[in-house]
Amino acid sequence: MPRQHAIEDYRNFGIMAHIDAGKTTTTERILYYTGKSHKIGETHEGAATMDWMAQEQERGITITSAATTAFWNGKRLNIIDTPGHVDFTIEVERSLRVLDGAVCVLDSNQGVEPQTETVWRQGDKYKVPRIVFCNKMDKTGADFYKCLADIVDRLGARPVAVQLPIGAESAFKGMVDLVRMKALVWNIDSAGAMYDIEEIPADLADKAREYREKLVEAAVELDDNAMAAYLDGTEPDEATLKNLIRKGVITGAFYPVLCGTAFKNKGVQPLLDAVVDFLPSPLDVPAIKGTDDKGNEILRHADDKEPMSLLAFKIMDDPFVGTITFCRIYSGILQSGTGVVNSTREKKERIGRMLLMHANNREDIKEAYAGDIVALAGLKEARTGDTLCDPAHPVILEKMEFPDPVIEIAIEPKSKADQEKLGVALAKLAAEDPSFRVSTDQESGQTILKGMGELHLDIKVDILRRTYKVDANIGAPQVAFRERVTKRVEHSYTHKKQTGGTGQFAAVTLIVEPSEPGKGYEFESKIVGGAVPKEYIPGVEKGIESVLGSGVVAGFPVVDVKVQLIDGKFHDVDSSALAFEIATRACFREALQKGKSVLLEPIMKVEVVTPEDYTGSVIGDLNSRRGQIQGQDMRGNANVINAMVPLMNMFGYVNNLRSMSQGRATFTMQFDHYAEAPANVSAEVQKKFA
């Protein structure tokens, strides 16, 4: 079957925002006006079409990025809903990775909030073209012009208004379209479906001219001919201006800013027009880079004629279909029943059912093309970030990077039946979410869950209980400490064991030293002249790696260490890889002690937004948690306090802050770096764990 929509008519985009900026409501309205959703789901009633997991409906925050296909003005929109809570930024990164553009939703009353900065930085990292929608213009305190200033001050970006609000707060009734120089005024009776195009109100005429001039000047900077014509007094016509704005968005020269209120159904259709007019198609963004099976860099262009390649960006467990893998097709054509190769894992797979997803109903399809976002049922091996491709033309597309978890909890199933269910459930959850890890504590035998924050783990436990019906006891959250050596040492160790017949013999000399933070573990063999035969070097590495997981201070993983094997001795008969592994293990442990190993603790970047009355209490409380205040500024009438605080002192902070500020202060927290723990903390941790 031939392609139904030309690839230049595709818009693969996401909606990104701070929690509560109205992102899910905006997505809902888009689905409603594009005819895919028959009734509007309200987030605060827990019924939004996109928020389809029970946990999301209760909390009113979006957790999983559902992918939905809709149509507007003959263009095909593939919308990825992204979570706005800081514990789920991994989901945001994952969806930004496969998008061509994004709509950044701001709360007009709050402007740029902490999580907006986080998702904006992630958008910068993946060079995602963006437009900005100032939502909630009907709210008390809504201020479109403050949002423009915030984008400059807090995001360091260049906003260009393409609309101006008509009225604000309860008097907000529409906007001035600066491209057409007309007023769009919403009809009160039509639930937002109808608006009138009118002349610009007289009291806004001067402001409209001023902002129109700024818009045109930003646009003509991108084209010499348009600039020359403009300097001669000729403004670009509507089609040229739209093309120039589109060019500005795609090159990242500026970010068009629109306004509206999704909840009150004003401004959604012009936002859809802007998505179509200004955001890129798959042809407007650079071809994706990959490597072939020989390690050479190759490109895959958005073209049906190129070999098929797709990237798995989300794995979900569906009660009706089983495991669903969401994929972005970067090149070629994919047919159901085709054999593909998972080049990341070197495994063969067969494509079973192919589905197009609307928030949570599905349509079976037989063929999908470059630019499509599809859900594949029945893949057994695929994990998030894997490449699937044509077996005749193998390629591994750019990999996604996932941060290490910083918080962990122990979980104990209550019965044998729960134990079995838990194993299956955890394997599925870990496959769905790469920032969630599962391990077994070697000494206690407990199952340990690791995640990005308290909320992240709360939700995983909730899913275990609800979806998988696992009854379990949950331990108190524990901090993921690390250990690191602080000085360079050279150390030798000889392992000798003689018990009749063949003995064991190996001697090694290691240099152990700290490497740069974030460098991880590095090993280098400096052996010359065969002091340690080549075949025993893997035994040496194995010995080091067996200690890395459990250091000498309190048994935590050792990070940022460089180990060099510089000398050794062996015996023709008694030496073996195992003997060298045993010798190295003992040598490395002693070297870590000699090298003054210290305990590292995760330090979180905390931002508290509080009414001024509570500032003193908040700062005093953060100081008592060993926090270091980095700075304060005003945001509207609230005080914003930035601090670096050890994670171990932040447990239960949400309840403390709530009671301290009568529920009026909010905070966000994300991992920033590891730092050496003070001696008293280290001693306390050693007592508990060593």
Swiss-Prot record:
Annotated protein name in UniProt: Elongation factor G
CDD domains: EF-G, EFG_III, EFG_mtEFG1_IV, EFG_mtEFG_C, EFG_mtEFG_II
Domain tr-type G positions: 8-283
SUPFAM superfamilies: EF-G C-terminal domain-like, P-loop containing nucleoside triphosphate hydrolases, Ribosomal protein S5 domain 2-like, Translation proteins
Protein family: Belongs to the TRAFAC class translation factor GTPase superfamily. Classic translation factor GTPase family. EF-G/EF-2 subfamily.
GO term, biological process aspect, one: ribosome disassembly
Cellular compartment(s): Cytoplasm
